[in-house]
């Protein structure tokens, strides 16, 4: 009962997960790092036809390329990007990893899959070539910049959104981790079961919910 009460609120559960991962970061990071976690910024430019740019589109594309030679990606994104979600944040699009390219991904990233794929192939501080993305809303050209690849810095990011996405990505990268955390806190709270049947039900619940093996 005490453990259930402790875990009822998602906020407390998140706290519990965060504390455990912070303490055991070097032990749990490998599976997550294999998914190439990073934070990225983007520049988006809408076009009518990527293969036949209009004079206006050609000029804008050229202006962006020239600006990137002299100015920071953030400044250029703020001045030129047509992405309504990120232009006012200096192009910052947040957290992505290799799972962000999957349609069944748990990622909340709004960065198109092709752009994420390009970002995964870049090092920190690098900018991609132009990437063409066609969706139901039309065709756009993107440039993506990798802002951070250090896993510890991403996990401890000042942005709650980024640090929360990193937390859930770590939990998702190892199916048994949530169970290990729960088991660790159960031992700390010194949970006692009055009978074997209750213990069996609890173990079954944990295994089903968190993927742990007793």
Language model: regions and residue ranges:
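PPIase-associated folding chaperone regions across multiple families
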Residues: 1-51, 55, 106-214
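Well-ordered, non-membrane alpha-helical segments in soluble/globular domains
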Residues: 56-64
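Peptidyl-prolyl cis-trans isomerase
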Residues: 63-114, 156-157
